[in-house]
Amino acid sequence: VPATIPLTITNDSGG
């Protein structure tokens, strides 16, 4: 899943 949107998959910080 492309972490384009700051979710909780790869982008824990979010933004």
Curated annotation (Swiss-Prot):
Q: Which reaction equation describes what this protein catalyses?
A: Hydrolysis of (1->3)-beta-D-glucosidic linkages in (1->3)-beta-D-glucans
* Cysteines engaged in disulfide bonds, as pairs: none
Look at the named UniProt entry and state the broad enzyme category this protein falls under.
hydrolase
Asked if the keyword Ion transport belongs to this entry, the reply reads no
UniProt EC number: 3.2.1.39
Which keywords does UniProt give here? Glycosidase, Hydrolase
GO molecular function per UniProt = glucan endo-1,3-beta-D-glucosidase activity
Give the protein name, as stated in the record: Glucan endo-1,3-beta-glucosidase 1
What species is given as this protein's source? Answer: Papiliotrema laurentii (Cryptococcus laurentii)
